[in-house]
């Protein structure tokens, strides 16, 4: 049985692509028809591709590797945080900082700084400082938390990256490709599918569509983790 049904995809609006003037010809194979100036995505292909992506993500989690969820557009931010947190994985939902993967050692130092500030605050170290200094440190901590909070527990590079809108997240996709980290993505009609290892053709703008797909990817992680526990 498929991970997601045609009915669920239709109800979430996964089939609505972009306007016909905003498209990538490489997506032609995933387009069912054109209606009122909008491309309609072939959901039969989405179901098949989704099953393959699900199995892959499950295998990554079963191997004890991490999955990094990436979605910085407004429609994806909350869902990406919720679903990554639900399955115990990492996320970037504000801004992709260049080098998050390719310059991970430097990013890791910033994460350690964030943890250090949290520890100092918890232990009461801020109490002996001036109000001005405390305000500066709190501001630094909040900024680090905003951009790096989702990868705070990521102590090594992930085994896969899940992306909402690879066109917007092109830097994240490029970094993953450079490091040979497989990319799973919701790919709308204006995106280039050639850059993605596991294409999920679908609407990357509707909140319900993003929620449905992201939640199933999180389910794949949880199922894979169960498999890891059984085999270890």
Curated annotation (Swiss-Prot):
Keywords, ordered alphabetically: Ribonucleoprotein, Ribosomal protein
GO cellular component, one term: cytosolic small ribosomal subunit
Pfam families with a match to the protein in the record: Ribosomal_S2 (PF00318)
InterPro entries named among the record's database cross-references: Ribosomal_uS2, Ribosomal_uS2_bac/mit/plastid, Ribosomal_uS2_CS, Ribosomal_uS2_flav_dom_sf
Gene Ontology BP annotations: translation
HAMAP family listed in its UniProt record: Ribosomal_uS2_B
Family: Belongs to the universal ribosomal protein uS2 family.
Protein name, UniProt field: Small ribosomal subunit protein uS2
Originating species: Syntrophomonas wolfei subsp. wolfei (strain DSM 2245B / Goettingen)
Lineage of source species: Bacteria, Bacillati, Bacillota, Clostridia, Eubacteriales
């Amino acid at each position: 049985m498929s991970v997601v049904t045609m009915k669920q995809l239709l109800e979430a609006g996964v089939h609505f692509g972009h306007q016909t003037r905003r498209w990538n010809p490489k997506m032609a194979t995933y387009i069912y028809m054109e209606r009122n100036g909008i491309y309609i995505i072939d959901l039969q292909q989405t179901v098949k591709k989704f099953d393959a992506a699900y199995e892959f993500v499950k295998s990554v989690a079963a191997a004890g590797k991490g999955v990094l969820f990436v979605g910085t557009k407004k429609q994806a931010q909350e869902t990406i945080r919720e679903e990554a947190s639900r399955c115990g994985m990492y996320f970037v939902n504000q801004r992709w900082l260049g080098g998050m993967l390719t310059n991970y050692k430097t990013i890791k130092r910033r994460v350690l700084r964030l943890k250090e500030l949290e520890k100092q605050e918890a232990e009461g170290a801020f109490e002996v400082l001036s109000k001005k200094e405390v305000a500066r440190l709190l501001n630094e901590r909040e900024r680090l938390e905003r951009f790096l909070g989702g990868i705070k527990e990521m102590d090594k590079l992930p085994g896969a990256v899940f992306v909402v809108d690879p066109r917007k997240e092109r830097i994240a996709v490029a970094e993953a490709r450079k490091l040979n980290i497989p990319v799973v993505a919701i790919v709308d009609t204006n995106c280039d599918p050639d850059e993605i290892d596991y294409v999920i053709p679908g609407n990357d703008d509707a909140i319900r569509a993003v929620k449905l797909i992201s939640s199933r990817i999180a389910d794949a992680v949880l199922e894979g983790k169960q498999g890891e526990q059984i085999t270890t």
